[in-house]
Amino acid sequence: SIYEHAFDIDEHYRSEMAERALILDNDPRRYLVMPHMQAAAWDALQMLMENLAIDYPQWFSLVRDGDRWHWRNHLLQIDQPFIFGDAASLPCAPLEYIGRQVQGDFALLDQRDGDLYMDAGLVTSPADWSLAFDAGMSFKQWHAPVPMANQMGVFDRALKYLLNLQAGQPVRRLNWTLTINPRLDSSPETFHQWGADRGRITAQNVGQQVHLRVELQVMARLPRSNAVMFSIR
């Protein structure tokens, strides 16, 4: 069930984390946190660590003593004491640190002036979009390429709904698209690696090459920063 756990960990965990590490090493632009989003990054780290420790106690544990936290990830052999709020106490910035240990992509949306702005995130397996390109865009701006939906008022209603998300009441939705080959990273940055495959589809191979890509999207209000965390799994 998609409602069983807040964030899903499955049998592909280690391989997907290894792939994420390679992508981040080759293209650091897949990670972004604007200066005003530091509190949101710590918010996201807390939400992810707490939920992983609750839902998968055999793999993750979190012990807190005030601002002194101790995180253990048994799947990746990580044992990390740190001070919450002090980035220098972690091997890397907080969103990147926890993002390297959780399956799925994460965007942090700053809410201001009656809109949501994509001002932070860690995205290594997008379906035809780019965090580096969308950085700083408003909700409607980054959805502009979606055909017909804006004219139908879909994004007006979606934005109104998301602006009213309450802390502690996350919402989930499923999104789907068609993709060529079972590839997670179909970003514009890697188009030269996979784009030509679209022109090779024939009536004879369509059944083997075209895949239904289904994404579980979770939208949650972060309590300290009031940002919205948008996860895509």
What kind of region is each of these model predictions?
Residues 1-233:
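Extended, well-ordered protein cores
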